[in-house]
Amino acid sequence: MGNQRPIAVDLFAGVGGMTLGFEQAGFDVLASVEIDPIHCATHEYNFPMWAAICASVTNISGNDIRKRSKIGDREVDVVFGGPPCQGFSLMGKRAFDDPRNQLVSHFMRLVTELNAKYFVMENVKGLTLGEHRHFVDEVIENFEKNGYKILKPYQVLNASHFGVPQHRERLFLIGCRQDLTLPHYPSPITKPAKAKRIPKELVDLPDSPTVRDVIADLPDVSQYPELIKRDWCVADFPEPKSNYSEYLRGLRSDSADLSYPRDCDRSLLTSSIRTVHSQTCMERFSKTANGELEKISHFLKLDPDGICNTLRAGTPSNRGAFTAPRPIHPFMPRCITVREAARLHSYPDWFRFHSTKWHRFRQIGNSVPPLLARAVALKIMQILEVQVSKPEEVIQLNEDG
């Protein structure tokens, strides 16, 4: 699997948005730890060459991770992940020590047990606001006590500044061992298309891809009745409308993408099961202007010349299994499909999701857009001073639907 590629470990891996971003930057993510068996199975499908460890971080050690993957006794270059934020308790002065916040402490424990050179911890922007900042300060303080220095000031990164057609802000904490040099945060490469206010430091940057760029070349799902009962079919694809969609379809190479090529059937339209809306609902969707909220559902109708709002996950089954609002397609009277959401999140078309619609949208909404993860990973690759080339090995994906 190319030992010259730096080694990474993904904690709280989900379906693997960060795994893919780090792979694209040139890392071999030899182990990914995820407690949810549904996410784990999806991760295993998309990354069959590496170990997907279905376990809780609370019950696993760094040595376990080494033994259950191909890491063995090799040095781990980076550990990354996003401890779930739903359980954060911020009451009291020592929130870090609250048992309800144990997932962050276990993330830190595994970073130190693996003696990782670098770590990246991502989380919601809300942790940087108000009283929540004290919790972030405690996290930093505890990492420093455990022999790691932190890149300061910490930053919130917006996916739309890194070539993703979606407004999505996430906190990234980056650190390294005391004997190493800290990297820098990545600098924006795009500004959000059709944004009402552009910070002056972004004015001269090219626009991010637009909603139109992203989904206009996907087949019209209403023309495929088989998509009412299953999530894939053989389809006729129009010509790509942008470099972005051409890249996600696997028809255009990207010199910055050092991921393993995937061998899959490109005639398949996947993750595209149809939502059956009532006639009344479709009429409301049709009457809603692009870029406006539909008055009853409060769903946003996407502006084809702008970017997508933040795609959210909804709540897990132990918290009510509520579905997050899905945007309305800019040209058709329906909500967007999972594949369209995946495109808006920068997932390539070979990437598959769970067959149940609720799980699939949750998988996307919970994940870091791969292009955003790649931007962060490239800065760590840069500081490691490792030269990595595009692998020749092709990964076969199972195409049984």
Where are these regions (language model features)?
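Short alpha-helical patches at coil-to-helix transitions and adjacent helical residues
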Residues: 15, 170, 208, 366-370, ...
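Redox-cofactor binding/interface segments in oxidoreductases and associated redox assembly factors
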Residues: 81, 121, 312-313
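Short Gly/aromatic-enriched secondary-structure transition segments
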Residues: 46, 188-190, 324-328
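Short glycine-rich anion-binding loops that position phosphate/pyrophosphate groups of nucleotides
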Residues: 83-86, 178-179, 316
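Core alpha/beta nucleotide-donor-binding catalytic domains of modification enzymes
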Residues: 2-115, 125-129, 133-137, 144
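Class I S-adenosyl-L-methionine
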Residues: 64-73, 91-292
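Short aromatic/basic micro-patch
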Residues: 82, 118, 335-338
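C-terminal target-recognition/interaction regions appended to catalytic cores
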Residues: 234-401
